[in-house]
Swiss-Prot record:
The protein's name in its UniProt record: Phosphomethylpyrimidine synthase
Reactions catalysed, as given in the entry: 5-amino-1-(5-phospho-beta-D-ribosyl)imidazole + S-adenosyl-L-methionine = 4-amino-2-methyl-5-(phosphooxymethyl)pyrimidine + CO + 5'-deoxyadenosine + formate + L-methionine + 3 H(+)
Species the sequence originates in: Prochlorococcus marinus (strain MIT 9215)
An example Gene Ontology molecular-function term: 4 iron, 4 sulfur cluster binding
NCBIfam families: PRK09284.1, PRK13352.1, thiC
Length: 456
């Protein structure tokens, strides 16, 4: 779809959506997003220029259907997939991608760390994906030197980052905000550093006793990104891994640096979103969202969860969806899903489905709470179908039609029950929606009550 859009841009020094927007040029991607979000094209261009909205769209991802992440657009959901040294293969990851897209993932991150050829699995995912693909390049940087931190050089990091851009990755998590002076602040935490990328860079800094190379070479990374229109997803290496560690000095020190890096990227006209926690008590979620907006000049916020309790292994998709809905309500632009396997193992296809549906609910609830135009239309349509016992319409409008139909049919599988004015909960005699009271009857009752009040 995008080949004809991209062709005139080839060879230019800066092909980012932000660069075009700041120069007053409405790209085809901006126009596409405007129609998708039912917003004026001029607003999309203005928000991209300001940095409050991003359109992750690498010029080498030609089958991409552009989408937006930002406060002006719908709250989005990301799904993580990826092979590990202990499980999965390329075909399984491609199937997870297709399943994620089927159940509504707005973006997908390939977090493969080994067990497969990382370049091949990434290329296969990008070729099959109509949604933006994100990656974490430090994983492959470490894998490229067979896990030897002492052999990992600054140039190795940049080489892998550019390789991901060349393949068509739309956004990359860059852990540039973790500084060597932040590391002592981790003392006193229960779970220390829980970010894999952050852990790799912490080890690198401790081993070499040098500053984070992603920070010192940040301008070089910007130069790479603007050639491909790859978007920064600034990683939160010091995100809290438990409630005890939430909103501590380590997390907030890194957040301040992430704000500095956001503005540095904008000087290059490179798009940015900022990643956030993690594990956060409910009463601290609003503070975390507001603090990010303040420190990062309202760049889109992208949070993992957050989980609101630490005692829900096997059900972390529920614990985190509670936090995600609140974060979305307060202004977070994208929610990274958590599956039932979080903290326990590599998610399979069913885990991907469970996590995505939980997060589509959270994002949709946030859009309703923020009074986005049309956000509740589908809810109202389903409610009318429910009141009229239109079972097939109810299934169709559900976030997971297959699951809704499956649960209904467990007790009433015959087709005749798709027209029945009851379900197996109340049966045919006790459903309160069966005895419908007409508006005319209610008006007559109202008149009689008013007469009684008047005569009294």
């Amino acid at each position: 779809m995008r080949s004809s859009w991209i062709k005139p841009r080839l060879g230019k020094n800066n092909v980012t959506q932000m660069n075009f927007a700041r120069n007053g040029y409405l790209t085809e991607e901006m126009d596409f997003v405007a129609k998708k979000e039912n917003l004026p094209s001029s607003l999309i261009m203005e928000e991209v220029a300001r940095g409050r909205l991003i359109i992750p769209a690498n010029i080498n991802h030609l089958n991409l259907e552009p989408m937006s992440i930002g406060i002006a657009s719908r709250c989005k959901v990301n799904a993580n997939i990826g092979a590990s040294p202990n499980a999965s293969d390329i075909n399984e990851e491609v199937e997870k991608l297709k399943l994620a897209v089927k159940y509504g993932a707005d973006t997908v991150m390939d977090l493969s760390t080994g067990g497969v050829n990382l370049d091949e699995v990434r290329q296969a995912i990008i070729q099959e994906s109509p949604v933006p693909i994100g990656t974490v390049p430090v994983y492959q940087a470490l894998e490229s030197v067979h896990g030897s931190i002492d052999r990992l050089t600054e140039d190795d990091f940049l080489h892998i980052i550019e390789k991901h851009c060349q393949q068509g990755v739309d956004y990359q998590t860059i852990h540039a905000g973790l500084l060597i002076e932040h590391l002592p602040k981790v003392k006193g935490r229960i779970t220390g550093i829980v970010s894999r990328g952050g852990g790799i860079l912490a080890q690198w800094m401790l081993h070499h006793f040098k500053q984070n190379p992603l920070y010192t070479r940040f301008d070089d990374i910007c130069e790479i990104f603007k050639k491909y229109d790859c978007t920064f997803s600034l990683g939160d290496s010091l995100r809290p891994g438990c409630l005890h560690d939430a909103s501590d000095d380590a997390q907030l020190a890194e957040l301040k640096t992430l704000g500095e890096l956001t503005r540095r990227a904008w000087e290059h006209n490179v798009q940015v979103m900022v990643e956030g926690p993690g594990h956060v008590p409910m009463d601290q979620i609003e503070f975390n969202v507001r603090k990010q907006m303040e420190e990062c000049s309202e760049a889109p916020f992208y949070v993992l969860g957050p989980l609101v309790t630490d005692i829900s292994p096997g059900y972390d998709h529920i614990s985190s969806a509670i936090g995600a809905a609140m974060a979305g309500w307060y202004g977070t632009s994208m929610l990274c899903y958590v599956t039932p396997k979080e903290h326990l193992g590599l998610p399979n296809a069913e885990d991907v489905r469970e996590g995505l549906i939980a997060y589509k609910i959270a994002a949709h609830a946030a859009d309703i709470a923020r009074h986005r135009a049309g956000a509740r239309d589908r809810d109202d349509e389903l409610s009318y179908a429910r009141y009229n016992f239109d079972w097939n319409k109810q299934f169709e409008l559900s976030l997971d039609p297959e699951r809704a139909k499956q649960y209904h049919d467990e007790t009433l599988p015959e087709e005749i029950f798709k027209k029945a004015e009851f379900c197996s909960m109340c049966g045919p005699k006790h459903c309160p929606m069966n005895s419908k009271i007409s508006d005319e009857s209610l008006d007559q009752l109202k008149d009689k009550l008013e007469e009684c009040n008047t005569s009294a």
